[in-house]
Structures are given as C-alpha cells and as structure tokens.
Amino acid sequence: TPLRIHLVDNPPLFAWVEKEYFDFTGDKRRLNHLLNEKRYLQKHFKWFARAKAGERFECSPQRIYLNSIGDDGFTWTGRASGMDNTPRGRDAGGYHKALWVDAISQQALSAHCIATMEQALGNENEARKWNAEYEALKKKINHLYWDERDGFYYDVTIADKQPCRVKTIASYWPLLARIASREQARSMVNHLMNPGEFGGSYPTPSLARSDKDYHHQTGDYWRGGIWLPTTYMAIKAIEKYGYHEEADAIAEKVINQQLAAYRNMEPHTVWECYSPSGDAPSTEHGRRVRPEFCGWSALGPIALFIENVLGFKKVSAAGKEVRGRLKKKKGRHGIRNLRFGDIVTDIVFDGKGTVSVTSNASYSLIINGNTYSVRKGDTEIKL
C-alpha cells in the first residue's frame, strides 16, 4: 500500500535520529547513502525551512500547518508540533501569530547533526557549510527568542517580536541543540528544577505550574501532562551542559511515577502521558489517555533507565567507546549484552569500587570522566 503520513509537518528530527543511530552502528555506508547519494536529510531540512501553510501531499490527508516566516522562524500549531492543546500562542492572539521556539531549534539541531555526520564521512566542505547554517540559526535564536528578564527561551510574537510568556517544556529544545551559553543554561536548569514551574516530585510537566492554564490534577494532555518524549529531550538537553545529577534525579522520579502507575492502575500498562501531580495517567478532554503506549513512553523504562539510572550515557561505535557514570549508592548494577558496532560487552559494577567487564573486542570505557582500556575477554577495573 502507498505510504500514508498523518501530519507531514511534525517535528524535523530525522537528522538527530540518524546521528544517534550512527553512534550505535558506526555504519558509514548508511550515512553515505543518506547524505551523499540521496541527500534525504538535506532535502528535508530545506523543505522545512521553506514550508508554506496549506501545502498538500498525496501521502497525507492533511494540509500542512507549518509556515516559514523567513529567517525569523516558523508558525506552527499544537497538532503539527505534537503538543496538541498547548496554550502557546495565547499572548500573540493565536498559533499563527507566534514564532515557535522549538521549530527553529529543531532545525538548528538538524544542521548540527548533519555537520557532525558529514565530518564523520570526511566531507570537510559540507561539514563547514552545515556548521555555518547551524551558527546562523544559533545567533538568530539567541537574539530573538531569549528573554533576559525571565532568563528563559520563549515563543515570540510575529507582530512586534515580543516574548509570549507561556513557559512550556518546548523551551528546552535550544539546550539540546547547544544554543544556550553556560549562563543561559544555568537559568534554564533553575526553571526546570523549580517546584513551582517544572520541578518537584513530578518533574517536566509540559506546561509550567505557574501558568494560568496549567491543569494540576491530570495535566489535561499538554496543559501540564508529563510526556516521555519531551521529558527525554529535556534530560538530554541539560546533560549537554554537565547537569548530570539533575538529569539523573529527574529521570528516576519519572520512571518511579511510571512504575507506580503501572502497579496501581488498571489496566497495568504504560500510558501515553502522565499526571503532573500523582501516580496516574493524564487525561484528554476528561478521558483517560491511551494505554499500551510503548511507542514513546517506553523511553522511560528503556532509554532513561539504561542511561540515567544504570548510568550508561553514551556509546560510539566509530570511536569504540562507552561513556558512563557509576554510583556506589546504587549498589551492584550494570548491563549485559550491550551492543555497539561489532562489539558486545557486559559491564557490571559491584557497588564498592570494582567494575567487571567482558567483551568480544577491545574498546575504551570512560567512567566518571576517567578512561580505562578494555581488552578482549575479561577486564577488571578498580575505580
């Protein structure tokens, strides 16, 4: 059957996904096919950059909502952005009257990832070109979307380029794209950890608790609901600036909420999104959200558990390395059959000071900032 796409103008995350996939596989043939032979990622970037609302494609029943406003960014909608009933655009007079900070930041992230992958292929000229694209977007975002008064990235009005002071989790996309300075990142982390905004016992609500449209009891979907895709994004975003303790703490709270909801609610399942005030699913228009939603909510018990609870943060098949943060307070823990490239390894920390590693090939294991050489066979590391 022909390809069918519900919303063509959903977030442009293909380049980020391919860069993460390359980290695991080291597959340069795939990169060459994507970037040199077909140029899929570049074409999608350029299409997104020039998109006009109302366009229609045979593969989708929907006209696109995304609208490019020159170099300043994009208008978007709740549905197309993925944040269906978000109150963003409230201060501007509607979705179509605001420039969306996540759209332009995701484009910057794409440019950065394309440049990184071109560099991996040895395409220096292309890497420079995409780095220049990234730097231009970075400059624009910091000039137009950063609000010095609140120390926060906001959507802005098209009419007078003033901040739309609706704090949402979407404002952490600039950090994932490494747009923020150290000082800007510190301010954003303060907002993220503030119990009156995005922190507390149930962190990363989609809308700040201080907002007048925040729905305390259930989150009412994107009016405070906790969504694993944006939670994962925010956690990875602050890690870019070294806030690992804060990232790990957020991850553990969210996973514990998922576990409690799984145990205590009927049916015992993984939910589409969660309440910002209790161990329960969120609601949409008064109805409980969808069950059996591993499509993205499994980011918690899989990705965040491995990366932020166990502490195995990053792999590089091309660089033959694993990066992690191991903590004695967690006791004995580790991972078995971790695969990246052609390497398969077990890494087990006894919780006291010894890491036992088994591998089918040599690689570098970077733990808590220190580099250790792992050989083929068994290796014992004293921390």
Model regions: which residues?
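Conserved helix-loop functional segments at active or binding sites
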Residues: 20-23, 120, 140-143, 147
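Alpha-helix C-terminal capping/termination sites
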Residues: 24, 119-123, 177-179, 240
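Extended, well-ordered alpha-helical scaffold segments
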Residues: 28-51, 110, 114, 121-142, ...
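Short, contiguous, pocket-lining structural segments
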Residues: 95-109, 126-129, 133, 166, ...
